Structures are given as structure tokens and as C-alpha cells.
UniProtKB/Swiss-Prot annotation:
InterPro entries found in the cross-reference section: KOW, Rib_uL2_dom2, Ribosomal_uL24, Ribosomal_uL24_CS, Ribosomal_uL24_KOW, Translation_prot_SH3-like_sf
Record SUPFAM superfamilies: Translation proteins SH3-like domain (SSF50104)
Ribosomal protein keyword on record: yes
Subunit field text: Part of the 50S ribosomal subunit.
Species this chain originates from: Xylella fastidiosa (strain Temecula1 / ATCC 700964)
This protein's name: Large ribosomal subunit protein uL24
GO annotation terms (biological process): translation
Keywords: Ribonucleoprotein, Ribosomal protein, RNA-binding, rRNA-binding
Protein family per UniProt: Belongs to the universal ribosomal protein uL24 family.
GO terms for cellular component: ribonucleoprotein complex; ribosome
NCBIfam families: rplX_bact
GO molecular function: rRNA binding; structural constituent of ribosome
């Protein structure tokens, strides 16, 4: 089954504390995604001299639920829904619902 979102897609956050922010999908974990420069949390880390890690507070991105993002349509500059189009040879393409343009082409 084809996925509605993929790693590297440009998305916009539609709900939560970071509503309106845009970023790129870094990682997908089931129904949660990590988006660059969105949903920063502070992590307390111990120093580890073997790995060269200094201790303290580290800001990093935390995952958000996939229902809180929409894929960014570059033609309109807004979030858009994703649809699928099946070609004659059986290929399944992702398309923007509002414009019908193929995503990533």
C-alpha cells in the first residue's frame, strides 16, 4: 500500500503548539513523524567522554502525530490533502487533491 506521506516531503503543521510551521519529514515511526525545526523538546543528557558527548540540556525534535500535518502544495503555498491516481500500467501516483498535480514530479 502506498503511503500518503514520505520521508523528505515538505509539510505544514495544522494543529498543536507549532501550528503554521513548515518543515521537512526526517523520520516516520508508524503514525508519528519527526519534522525538522518543529516540536523541540529539551533532553537531559549525562556526559559520556567515550563518545565525546558533553552533558546538559539538548534541544531536539520530538515526533508529532501524522494527523497534525498536511503536505505543502508548492503551487498554492498551503497544506493539501493527498490522493492517489492509478495509471494504465498499474503504477500508483500521489497527487494533490486541490490541483491534481503529481507530488514530487
Amino acid at each position: 500500500m502506498a503511503s500518503r506521506i514520505k520521508k523528505g516531503d515538505q509539510v505544514i503543521v495544522i494543529a498543536g503548539k507549532d501550528k503554521g510551521k513548515q518543515g521537512e519529514i526526517i523520520r516516520i515511526d508508524g503514525h508519528r513523524v519527526v519534522v525538522s525545526n518543529v516540536n523541540f523538546v529539551k533532553r537531559h543528557t549525562k556526559p559520556n567522554p567515550q563518545r565525546g558527548i558533553s552533558g546538559g540540556l539538548i534541544d531536539r525534535e520530538a515526533p508529532i502525530h501524522v494527523s497534525n500535518i498536511k503536505i505543502l502544495n508548492p503551487m498554492t503555498g498551503k497544506g493539501d490533502r493527498v490522493g492517489f491516481k492509478i495509471l494504465g500500467d498499474g503504477c500508483k501516483l500521489r497527487i494533490f487533491r486541490s490541483t491534481g498535480e503529481v507530488i514530487g514530479a
